[in-house]
Every structure is written in C-alpha cells, then in structure tokens.
C-alpha cells in the first residue's frame, strides 16, 4: 500500500504547517459546502495503480477498486465525481494546493499523516501474508520461514519481515516475478500484502498458489482530505452507509473475490 514518505511529502508537510501558522487552517471555508455548491467531488488518484486506480487496456477508461469507491462516496454526498490523475509523489501537494478535495488512492493511515491531513475511517484493511505453492503444507506460520527461501523486492518492508523470520531472501522486481520463482520451485514462499495475492488470484484464476499463513501485520487505507476539513465527517458517514448497504463488500468481491473493507 501507499506508505512512502518522499521529499515531495516533506515539502507538503512544511506547507501544511505554514498554513496552520497563518491561522485559518488548511481547510478554510466549508469544503463540504463548496463541493455541494459545485456539485462535484474532485478526487486525486494515480490512474496507474492496478487494481485500485488504472486504465482498462481495452477501453482506456479509468477503473479500479478505489475509482469505484470514490464514485460511490460522491453519490452518497449527492454530487458527481471528477478524477484528477496525479503521480503518487505529488498527490499530497495537489491536495494541499486544492487541486482536488480528497485523495482516494490506498493512502495508508500512519501517525505522520494523521498529524498533517484529515483522514477518514478505513475503507480497506490489508494484512501481511505468506504465499506458497498450493500443495505445500510446510508453512503455517511466520516462524516456519526459518531456513526457507523467499522471493522479495529488496526495497520493500516484506523483505525485512522475511529476513527477520530467518528466511533466505532472493531479490525480485515485483510480485509477478516472485510468483514465477515460486511456481518454478526456485523459492519456497513469498511474503506480501494480502491484496497483492488476492488480486493475482482473481485476475489470473491461478490456483497453484495459496495464502498459507499471516504475518500478523495489518494496515488501514483511508480517504485523505485537508487538515480540519469538514469533508471528513461527511465521507465517514458515506463510508458507513456504503458498508451497511453492502456496496463496499460488492466492490471488494469484484476486484479481490473477498471483502477487504473489513478485518477478516
């Protein structure tokens, strides 16, 4: 999920703090009233982050889990949605400069972001898992990785999780390559976010790998708004309604084959 804290994010943090010192808060006048008056909720999203926000190869239409969540939230607010495609490294700067009203792009909740932005209740809950070949019953816990080989992107936090568990880590470029090595029996497992595994299984229909165990790590993905924005309460209400009426579950099932809007 989207957890990186880049130089661009540092500049954004400074801008937010300076705005707060100016006395008016970064939310300013009622953001909700402005959205209602305009009849549009402007949403910052990448458009290059499958299966959350990406362009369908056939139609080139912007689609994805987060794209549909954004549309559903806007509908609950009684407005249309307008997507503002923005690279991840500048997406928070775009929010601060009011290019859009909210970010819906798998923003992971953490203490730094809680201090800088208005964050909604979670609409996605993900967890670390260990994927193995479907016919391998030797891994049932994180401790079972000791002495085994795992395929990991060396810059990811999952590589550290595997190493700390005593695994021998082989570097790969991403999850797809990790699965290839796993199926070729060149490694015993790969540690990753459950959403990556579920997306792979749903999009490929490949039943040769399975989720064998959980790492115990979870993360929550939220909608980000400007600090002090009254949109947070309205979005929270919309998300609660979407959870209650089954919309979030339906969208989750479409993209992942299971409900990722709630903790399993």
Predicted regions and their residues:
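Alpha-to-beta junction loops
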Residues: 78-80, 97-105, 148-149, 184-196, ...
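Extended ligand-binding regions for polar small-molecule ligands
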Residues: 22, 67-68, 75-76, 156, ...
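Extracytoplasmic small-molecule ligand-binding "clamshell" domains
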Residues: 28-104
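C-terminal motif of bacterial Sec signal peptides marking the signal peptidase cleavage site
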Residues: 15-20
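Short helix-initiation/N-cap motifs at beta->coil->alpha
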Residues: 67, 83-93, 137, 154-156, ...
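Short loop->beta-strand "edge-of-pocket" segments that line small-molecule binding or catalytic clefts
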Residues: 40-45, 142-154
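Periplasmic-binding protein-like
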Residues: 125-129, 198-240, 258-264
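Acidic, polar ligand-binding/catalytic clefts
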Residues: 71, 80-144
């Amino acid at each position: 999920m989207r957890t990186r804290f880049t130089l661009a994010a540092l500049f954004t943090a400074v801008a937010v703090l300076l705005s707060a010192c100016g006395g008016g808060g970064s939310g300013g006048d009622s953001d909700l009233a402005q959205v209602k008056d305009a009849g549009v909720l402007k949403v910052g999203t990448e458009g290059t982050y499958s299966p959350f926000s990406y362009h369908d190869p056939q139609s080139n239409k912007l689609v994805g889990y987060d794209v549909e969540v954004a549309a559903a939230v806007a509908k609950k607010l009684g407005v249309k949605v307008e997507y503002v495609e923005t690279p991840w490294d500048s997406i928070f700067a775009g929010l601060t400069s009011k290019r859009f009203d909210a970010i819906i792009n798998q923003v992971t909740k953490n203490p730094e972001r809680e201090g800088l932005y208005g964050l909604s209740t979670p609409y996605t809950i993900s967890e670390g898992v260990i994927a193995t070949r479907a016919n391998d019953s030797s891994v049932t816990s994180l401790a079972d990785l000791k002495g085994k080989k795992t395929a990991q992107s060396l810059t990811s936090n999952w590589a550290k999780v595997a190493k700390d568990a005593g695994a021998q880590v082989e570097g790969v470029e991403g999850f797809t390559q990790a699965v290839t090595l796993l199926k070729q029996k060149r490694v015993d497992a790969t540690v990753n976010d459950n959403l990556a595994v579920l997306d792979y299984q749903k999009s490929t229909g490949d039943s040769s790998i399975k989720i064998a165990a959980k790492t115990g790590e979870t993360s929550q993905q939220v909608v980000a708004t400007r600090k002090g924005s009254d949109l947070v309460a309205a979005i929270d209400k919309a998300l609660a309604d979407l959870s209650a009426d089954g919309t979030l579950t339906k969208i989750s099932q479409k993209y992942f084959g299971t409900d990722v809007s709630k903790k399993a």
